[in-house]
């Protein structure tokens, strides 16, 4: 088990509390993604975590498969779904490795992967797999933390690393857009959202021809 999987397995029960600091940013990203969703779409979500994006978007499409590499994260997501009491037709959960997906080529209309590419040792492999399972012209939603500014950002990053979390790439907003564009996608949106401490790149891209 790699170090980051150990981290997520260990801290899954308190992840949602930790992420409360970016709730407003997540809400804004959901608002920006909704216009790109259609009722007949089949969507795959990678690295769903505790379901913070899952539960605000999954009811907008035909089917939504929420997956994560860390089984404890999936457990928390399922528990949150059951406690919520709202039935989302077409929502399913499964444990999957984003770099080695079991699905057939061109299986999905869109793929969501939030705050995960920067913590993968080989994000290129994940993007290759995402391209493979996306239909021609399929969409990628990849909101991702990018490099912030100031002492508060440095302190937050250092604190997270102290507890065992590792970011393999630390791109600026523009660098992340270039990275996505270099791996088989046409970038449609990449606006930076949030403050200096925990900014997010609202990445929306389309599978290149």
For the regions a protein language model found, what residue spans apply to each?
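Class I S-adenosylmethionine-dependent transferase superfamily signal
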Residues: 33, 57, 130
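Conserved class I S-adenosyl-L-methionine
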Residues: 1-39, 52, 76, 83-85, ...
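C-terminal alpha-helical "lid/dimerization" subdomain adjacent to the S-adenosyl-L-methionine
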Residues: 2, 18-22, 141-199
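Class I SAM-dependent methyltransferase SAM/SAH-binding core
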Residues: 44-100
């Amino acid at each position: 088990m790699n170090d980051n999987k150990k981290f997520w397995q260990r801290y899954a029960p308190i992840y949602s509390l930790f992420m409360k600091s970016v709730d407003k940013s997540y809400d804004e990203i959901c608002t920006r993604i909704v216009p790109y969703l259609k009722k007949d779409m089949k969507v795959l979500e990678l690295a769903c975590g505790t379901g913070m994006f899952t539960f605000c978007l999954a009811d907008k499409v035909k089917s939504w498969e929420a997956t994560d590499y860390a089984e404890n994260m999936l457990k928390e997501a399922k528990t949150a779904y059951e406690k919520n009491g709202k039935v989302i037709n077409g929502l399913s959960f499964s444990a999957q490795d984003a770099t080695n997906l079991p699905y057939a080529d061109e299986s999905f209309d869109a793929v969501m992967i939030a705050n995960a590419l920067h913590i993968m040792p080989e994000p290129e492999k994940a993007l290759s797999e995402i391209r493979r399972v996306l239909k021609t012209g399929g969409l990628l939603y990849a909101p991702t933390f990018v490099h912030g500014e100031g002492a508060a950002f440095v302190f937050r990053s250092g604190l997270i690393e102290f507890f065992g979390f590792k970011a393999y790439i630390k791109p600026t907003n523009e660098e992340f857009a270039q990275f996505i564009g270099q791996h088989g996608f046409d970038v449609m949106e990449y606006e930076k959202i949030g403050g200096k401490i925990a900014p997010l790149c609202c990445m929306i891209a389309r599978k290149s021809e």
